[in-house]
């Protein structure tokens, strides 16, 4: 067993060996290394063919048409292109956008930029379970609302939004629906034929593909128009210029094909391991799962251990690669904005750890994790005066702390 044990699959995944092998065939002189836009010789034709195969593989994963897939550098770029692209193209129709406070920074920061450009954004607050109620979403809709951007699976707490209901509501109001599927694509089924979603952000490195590659699904019927954010060459039907990274795209395509093939088996294994982990630590006093218990993806599991500092816990769990929030924000000592939006106080938000389980996690690793977590919590609480006061029956909410 390799230490530290990797339990941070929501931050990134290792490239599946089947994907890496396929990518290696598209990098060197002996492989298919040409520029897919080179139409005058075989090197270009072969590269274009490899890109076409990958485009079909990504489309198959979500039951889309291959012409609806636009390759990007990742889900962050996809979300930027989707949100800004819609806002800029349809600005005469309206300048109001709806999103939620628990979205990824790729969505939130893009919306903040649009606010600086004169757009209005409504940031919905979820219920304590992390889910946006449909009536709250509908109440926020206005005549000038052009876009709703809600993530499928939350990257910190793993809750799943009802995208079918959101899609139906948006379509009935003539509002475009963008979905950030960075954490869900390749892990839970997505079918664009039955779900009325117009734009989907997809990430390669969250589904055992390479970093630096992603895709944006752009619906053709009814047709969605975007204003390009990257100019120079008119690649990807004018939506995203730049030489196509053949080996990366092939990697994304193969990752999508493997994910589709292994999805049911992966899901069953990951659910088993998540249940095993929770059953092994739920006896620890003052331990709480964050987010809805039912409507969730089993691979992301966020737990608060009351009366323990998250940072000290992470130091104690040095044998486990885990995070105290999303990788994009765990470098900050601020409590998770996602957990704060759920109504958790600073102490509970600070004492939370995100465990994310993936394709290569083993039973042995989970056993070791349970032992490490249990021992670390006991040790840290032994040193905690707050824990001692709590055990003595003192209501810490009522304590008046002296300021120095």
UniProtKB/Swiss-Prot annotation:
GO terms for molecular function: 2 iron, 2 sulfur cluster binding; cysteine desulfurase activity; metal ion binding; pyridoxal phosphate binding. Belongs to the class-V pyridoxal-phosphate-dependent aminotransferase family. NifS/IscS subfamily. The keyword Transcription does not apply. Its cofactor is pyridoxal 5'-phosphate. It catalyses: (sulfur carrier)-H + L-cysteine = (sulfur carrier)-SH + L-alanine. Its main location: cytoplasm. Pyridoxal 5'-phosphate binds at residues 75-76, 155, 183, 203-205, 243. The active site is at 328 (cysteine persulfide intermediate). Keywords: 2Fe-2S, Cytoplasm, Iron, Iron-sulfur, Metal-binding, Pyridoxal phosphate, Transferase. Its EC number is 2.8.1.7. PANTHER family: CYSTEINE DESULFURASE, CYSTEINE DESULFURYLASE FAMILY MEMBER. Homodimer. Forms a heterotetramer with IscU, interacts with other sulfur acceptors. This is Cysteine desulfurase IscS. GO terms for biological process: [2Fe-2S] cluster assembly. It is found in: Cytoplasm. Pathway: Cofactor biosynthesis; iron-sulfur cluster biosynthesis. The modification N6-(pyridoxal phosphate)lysine is found at residue 206. [2Fe-2S] cluster binds at residue 328. It comes from the Bacteria.
């Amino acid at each position: 067993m390799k230490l530290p044990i990797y339990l941070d699959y929501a931050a990134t995944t290792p490239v599946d060996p089947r994907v890496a092998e396929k990518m290696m065939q598209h990098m060197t002189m002996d492989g298919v290394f040409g520029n897919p836009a080179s139409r005058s010789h075989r090197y270009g034709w072969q590269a274009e063919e490899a890109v076409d195969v990958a485009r079909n593989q990504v489309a198959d994963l979500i039951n889309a048409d291959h012409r609806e897939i636009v390759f990007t550098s990742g889900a962050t770029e996809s979300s930027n292109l989707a949100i800004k692209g819609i806002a800029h193209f349809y600005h005469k129709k309206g300048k109001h956008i709806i999103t939620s406070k628990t979205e990824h920074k790729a969505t939130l920061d893009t919306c903040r930029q649009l606010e600086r450009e004169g757009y209005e954004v409504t940031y919905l607050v979820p219920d304590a379970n992390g889910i946006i109620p449909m009536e709250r979403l509908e109440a926020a809709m206005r005549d000038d609302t052009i876009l709703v951007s809600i993530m499928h699976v939350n990257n910190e707490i793993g809750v799943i939004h009802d995208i079918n209901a959101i899609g139906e509501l948006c379509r009935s109001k003539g509002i475009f629906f963008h979905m950030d599927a960075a954490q869900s694509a390749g892990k839970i089924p997505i079918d664009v034929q039955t779900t009325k979603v117009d734009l989907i952000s997809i990430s390669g490195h969250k589904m055992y593909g390479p970093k630096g590659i992603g895709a944006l699904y752009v619906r053709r019927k009814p047709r969605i128009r975007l204003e390009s954010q990257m100019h120079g060459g008119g690649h990807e039907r004018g939506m995203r210029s730049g030489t196509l990274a053949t080996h990366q795209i092939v990697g994304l395509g193969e990752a999508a094909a493997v994910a589709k093939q292994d999805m049911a088996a992966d899901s069953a294994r990951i659910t088993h391991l998540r249940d095993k982990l929770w059953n092994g630590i739920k006896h620890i006093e003052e331990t709480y799962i964050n987010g809805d218990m039912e409507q969730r993806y089993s691979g992301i599991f966020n737990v608060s251990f009351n009366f323990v500092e998250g940072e000290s816990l992470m130091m104690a769990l040095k044998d486990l690669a885990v995070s105290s929030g999303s990788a994009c924000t765990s470098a900050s000592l601020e409590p998770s904005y996602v957990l704060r939006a759920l109504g958790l106080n600073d102490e509970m938000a600070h004492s939370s750890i995100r465990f994310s389980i993936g394709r290569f996690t083993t039973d042995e690793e989970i056993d070791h994790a349970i032992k490490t977590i249990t021992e670390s919590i006991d040790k840290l609480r032994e040193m905690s005066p707050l824990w001692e006061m709590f055990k003595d029956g003192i209501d810490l909410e009522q304590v008046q702390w002296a300021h120095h």
